[in-house]
Curated annotation (Swiss-Prot):
Protein name stated in the entry: 5-hydroxymethyl-dUMP N-hydrolase
Location relative to the cell: Cytoplasm; Nucleus
Catalytic activity: 5-hydroxymethyl-dUMP + H2O = 5-hydroxymethyluracil + 2-deoxy-D-ribose 5-phosphate
Residues where N-acetylalanine is found: 2
Gene Ontology CC annotations of this record: cytoplasm; nucleus
Organism expressing this protein natively: Mus musculus (Mouse)
């Protein structure tokens, strides 16, 4: 248990495209690097420059990857997704995160020329599910803004899906 005033790190599930395209890999690396300031990033491999567009070659195949990633998603306190590069996997992860009641931040770059799916933008409720437009040079600032608002002091263990998030500010962002 953390002492009063001590920040307890989050378990963060980061979503980014793998098989849908690796064009944003360098950006994912910046995001994961920043997310490490706020807690343990369970899905650091998404940012790995060595990860091929066809995905990782796990010993148990696709089923193993699915089960492992769902276990990480259940463990996570918060989900952060870069949703500019369309990805069926990221959409699936977000749907599962919603079903699990996880707080979600989706980041989208309108300057990409893409249009974000209505199923993502339309899910935003300004509270548990947030979609923020940003420019690439703002990514660290956006993450800082989100976690500064959501991370309370002296929170409990990550067995609670919202343990590292401050519920008193959910409506204020």
């Amino acid at each position: 248990m953390a002492a009063s005033g001590e920040l307890v790190p989050c378990s963060v599930y980061f979503c980014g495209s793998i098989r849908g395209g690796r064009e944003d890999q360098a950006l994912y690396s910046r995001i994961v690097s920043r997310l490490r300031r706020y807690g343990k990033v369970l899905t650091e491999h998404v940012a790995d420059a060595e990860l091929e567009p066809r995905g990782e070659e796990a010993a148990g195949g696709d089923q193993f990857i699915h089960e492992r990633d769902l276990a990480w998603l259940r463990q996570a306190d918060v989900v952060v997704a870069e949703v500019t590069q369309p990805s069926l996997g990221v959409g699936y992860e977000l749907g599962r995160a919603v079903a699990l009641g996880k707080p979600i931040l989706c980041l989208f770059r309108p300057q990409s020329g893409r249009v974000l799916s209505a199923m993502i933008r339309g899910a935003a409720d300004g509270s548990r599910f947030q979609v923020w437009d940003y420019a690439e040079e703002e990514v660290e600032t956006m993450l800082h803004r989100y976690f500064e608002a959501y991370l309370p002091q002296g929170t409990a263990s990550s067995s609670n899906p919202s343990a590292c998030l401050n519920p008193t500010v959910l409506e204020k962002i």
